[in-house]
A protein has these predicted regions:
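Short amphipathic alpha-helix that is part of the acyltransferase structural core
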Residues: 1-27
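Short secondary-structure junctions
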Residues: 3-4, 121-125
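A short helix-loop-beta-strand connector motif used in the catalytic cores of GNAT acetyltransferases and
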Residues: 31-46
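Conserved donor-binding loop and adjoining core beta-sheet/short helix segment
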Residues: 44-79
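Conserved catalytic-core motifs of GNAT/GCN5-like acyltransferases
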Residues: 105, 123-134
Length: 134
C-alpha cells in the first residue's frame, strides 16, 4: 500500500536509496526538499522494508500550467510490478491536485527513458542545456 509520510527517519531512509540510483541529487538536497513541506509530498510502500518511494512536487511549469513533478522515484528491483502501481498512483495524485501535466527530469539515456516511460503515455517535450560553473 502506498501512503504519504512525514516521518524524518523515513526521509533519511529515502535519502539512502540515492546510492542505488544514478540520480544526481545529493542526500542533503533531497532531504532539504522533502522537509520543505508546502508543495512537496512523500509517499512510500513499507511492509517489513521499504519497497518503493516517490517524492513529488506540485508547481507551475515554465508555461504556467499546474504540474506534478516527480523529484525522486525508487523501487526495490525485487518488486518490479510495483513500478506500474506507482505510475498509476502518481497519475491519480496529479488528478487529485488538479494538475494538467506530470513531468520528471532525468540524466539517463533519452532512448531508454522514452522506451520505459512511453508505455505510460510520457513523451519528451523539453531539452535542458546547461553549463557548469565552478
Amino acid at each position: 500500500m502506498i501512503k504519504e509520510i512525514k516521518d524524518i527517519n523515513t526521509y533519511l531512509e529515502i535519502c539512502d536509496k540515492l546510492e542505488y540510483t544514478d540520480c544526481k541529487l545529493s542526500k542533503k538536497a533531497l532531504y532539504g526538499f522533502m522537509v520543505a513541506g508546502k508543495n512537496v509530498h512523500v509517499y512510500t510502500t513499507i511492509e517489513e522494508e521499504m519497497k518503493g518511494c516517490a517524492v513529488i512536487s506540485v508547481n507551475n511549469d515554465i508555461s504556467g500550467d499546474l504540474t506534478l513533478s516527480v523529484v525522486f522515484l525508487w523501487m526495490n528491483p525485487h518488486y518490479r510490478k510495483l513500478w506500474k502501481n506507482y505510475m498509476k498512483f502518481i497519475e491519480l495524485k496529479a488528478i487529485e491536485f488538479h494538475c494538467k501535466k506530470i513531468s520528471f527530469t532525468t540524466s539517463r539515456s533519452e532512448k531508454s527513458i522514452e522506451r520505459q516511460m512511453g508505455k505510460y503515455g510520457y513523451k519528451k517535450v523539453y531539452s535542458i542545456i546547461e553549463k557548469e560553473l565552478i
